[in-house]
Amino acid sequence: MSKYQTHLKQLEAESIQIMREVAAEFDNPVMLYSVGKDSSVLLHLARKAFYPGKIPFPLMHVDTNWKFKEMIDFRDKMAKKHGFDLIVHKNPRGMEMGVGPFTHGSAKHTDIMKTEGLKQALDMHGFDAAFGGARRDEEKSRAKERVYSFRDSKHRWDPKNQRPELWNIYNGKVDKGESIRVFPLSNWTELDIWQYIYLEGIEIPSLYLAAERPVVERDGTLIMVDDERMPIEEGEKVENKMVRFRTLGCYPLTGAVESQAQTLPEIIQEMLLCTTSERQGRVIDNDSAGSMEKKKMEGYF
């Protein structure tokens, strides 16, 4: 076994230990399933952690109504294939208002449909711990967040008041109404994720692989035209380009990258030469300075 495989096995063991710890320690945990590559790895790890039994907590998808069509199809296929309990939540107030990224802007859309939608769902089901697939290498505010990220009764995160974590000892004490966000993939990198997906044969949406797709260049970002709701502005032209996505979210807010990587080994090779964060394609991260940290302090994942 190579050193890198051993490294991945160590990361796998750490993540599985965290999942088992949460399942034993908390009354009502849930796993946030956003259908991306990190969520796919989390699902795979959860199935391993509790094999041959069933995953002892539900998976939940906060649906903004603007996800890529393929993501929704993939989500439903995985739920049927693996038989896990799936909760899908859409913010009813946002749906009634017709909130969307084009009509209300990216910041308001994200706040109402993602942040408020997530808080609604957590309160509705009384979850006291929620797994997420965030990693420290993704973004600077996530780099300083603990594996067990304490949230108050309003789901807010205080980056100046985080609990110490010594080695693999986690403090899960919460009072009524408080909760913990748990990040088992904290110490993984994007390259680790892709190598693990390849070695374990984990199924992922084909949006991660390069293919000819209809895109519009807007403010320097390639936006895929995923359905008829995408407005084409004056002077814009829809072109078919070989693109793939390094991260997945609401399609109008997720930029594609030009790429020829059509297989997992080609993606891994591309990652070895890449010097930019995968979240460079997330429009919401550029709403304002410190945008992600502000969102997390308001309750965003």
Swiss-Prot record:
Catalytic activity as recorded in UniProt: sulfate + ATP + H(+) = adenosine 5'-phosphosulfate + diphosphate
Pfam name, any one: PAPS_reduct
UniProt keyword annotations, A-Z: ATP-binding, Nucleotide-binding, Nucleotidyltransferase, Transferase
Record keyword ATP-binding present: yes
Enzyme Commission designation: 2.7.7.4
Pathway the protein acts in: Sulfur metabolism; hydrogen sulfide biosynthesis; sulfite from sulfate: step 1/3
Gene3D superfamilies noted in UniProt: HUPs
Leading EC class: transferase
Entry keyword annotation includes tRNA-binding: no
UniProt GO molecular function: ATP binding; sulfate adenylyltransferase (ATP) activity
Alphabetized InterPro entries for the sequence: PAPS_reduct_dom, Rossmann-like_a/b/a_fold, SO4_adenylTrfase_ssu, Sulfate_adenylyltrnsfr_sub2
GO terms classed as biological process: hydrogen sulfide biosynthetic process; sulfate assimilation
Function in brief: With CysN forms the ATP sulfurylase (ATPS) that catalyzes the adenylation of sulfate producing adenosine 5'-phosphosulfate (APS) and diphosphate, the first enzymatic step in sulfur assimilation pathway. APS synthesis involves the formation of a high-energy phosphoric-sulfuric acid anhydride bond driven by GTP hydrolysis by CysN coupled to ATP hydrolysis by CysD.
HAMAP family: Sulf_adenylyltr_sub2
Family that this chain belongs to: Belongs to the PAPS reductase family. CysD subfamily.
Subunit-structure text: Heterodimer composed of CysD, the smaller subunit, and CysN.
Record protein name field: Sulfate adenylyltransferase subunit 2 2
